[in-house]
Amino acid sequence: MKHAIRHIHFVGLGGAGMCGIAEVLFNLGYEISGSDLADSATLRRLAALGIATRVGHAAAHIEGADAVVTSTAVQSDNPEVIAARERKIPVVPRALMLAELMRLKRGIAIAGTHGKTTTTSLVTSVLAEAGLDPTFVIGGRLNSAGANAKLGQGEYIVVEADESDASFLNLLPVMAVVTNIDADHMETYGHDFGRLKSAFVDFLHRMPFYGTAILCTDNPAIREILPDVTCPVTSYGFSEDAQVRAVDVRADAGRMRFRVQRRNGVTLPDLDVVLNLAGEHNVLNALSAIAVAVELNIPDEALLRALAQFKGVGRRFQRYGELPAQGGGTFTLIEDYGHHPVEMTATLAAARGAFPGRRLVLAFQPHRYSRTRDCFEDFVKVMGSADAVLLTEVYAAGEAPIVAADGRSLARAVRVAGQVEPVFVDDIGELPRRIADNARGGDVVLCMGAGSIGAVPAKVVEMLRTDVPAMQEDR
């Protein structure tokens, strides 16, 4: 073809949703280049693979490109985007490029407000353990693979489906999981929860007639859309009517044990499961992977091994080990990407279950002024459930400040609620020192947020344990 695509350039290459697609395309034989505003471990890893990376944005970076891929985080006035349009080079949204990748395989798409990354990772791990060698594109680093993405030789591709910008409506999977539907990213849907629910129905109806929807019917909004879903459905959850149901759930030294009843069209023997993750929310995530395994006729032995040996995902209840505390003893440091009150509630409960009787210190950076405004009272409530709170200013993520939706306002409201006395840390750069100063022996310190707080745990480790490797991930 005269206009064959050989060289693809990514604007915002370091983003969690972009780097994986770029890596898979690179391994398919395309020439890949990309740029990002700041240097990162992701850019350095991609450069080591042979991908041409640039820090900063300039029109010259797209030289020779046949297509330019952008995410919704990239503004239309980006010089590389402007240059591409001037030169009539196709500018392709990230979701459309992901949809093109999915055309090469049988797609399994994981959607939902919370739990997408962990669920996608669990499904990927189950397929891999069964010898199906899936391709995957995940929004976090799968620890067992050391990457966000991999080009497999099998027939399946497992991907996250992003509802935040409605881009999941571009995907055409043959199997779709929806973990839950909650009010988040509501600006995309005109602050209309009904429109958000309808978008999920539309997403499910993107599947072919032989596709299967795997839905968590514990979630009220998913229950509400069920009458509108016309494709075959497998339900999962703790509810009595769930076709793939967990019972006898209990925490066990940072893991979860439970029994699974499988009644989705065919009665299979119950399974006694050990899941190498903490928290009941992760039991639900595992149930979706079990439902996928049933649909694909994956042997129980492979399924159980994958769940018991799961090595986790970067920034999802990621453990950094034991660190020396002021006054003697050690404290446990954990990082989690959760930044919505529902996610935070589940993660705090998981920490309580994994470390019973220990003081729980929450270090939290709110993400986006709009979310802080929309979920203000819920944030106050969930922070009040911790034993101590270190709270930073809001990570703007490109948004303009909103009156009374900033970190100080949130700290005042938590203080007035009277459950805990928060410590407000105005400068995120000071947070590592404040954590070190406030942590006592026996504490569990949980760093939560989707913004720049992601760099804090490693800095705490560097500060307190300079004589050992800088990071210990998971178990």
Curated annotation (Swiss-Prot):
Intracellular or extracellular location(s): Cytoplasm
NCBIfam families (alphabetical): murC
Protein name according to UniProt: UDP-N-acetylmuramate--L-alanine ligase
GO cellular component: cytoplasm
EC number of this enzyme: 6.3.2.8
EC top class, as a word: ligase
Example of a GO MF term: ATP binding
Species name: Paracidovorax citrulli (strain AAC00-1)
Similarity annotation: Belongs to the MurCDEF family.
Annotated binding of ATP, by residue: 112-118
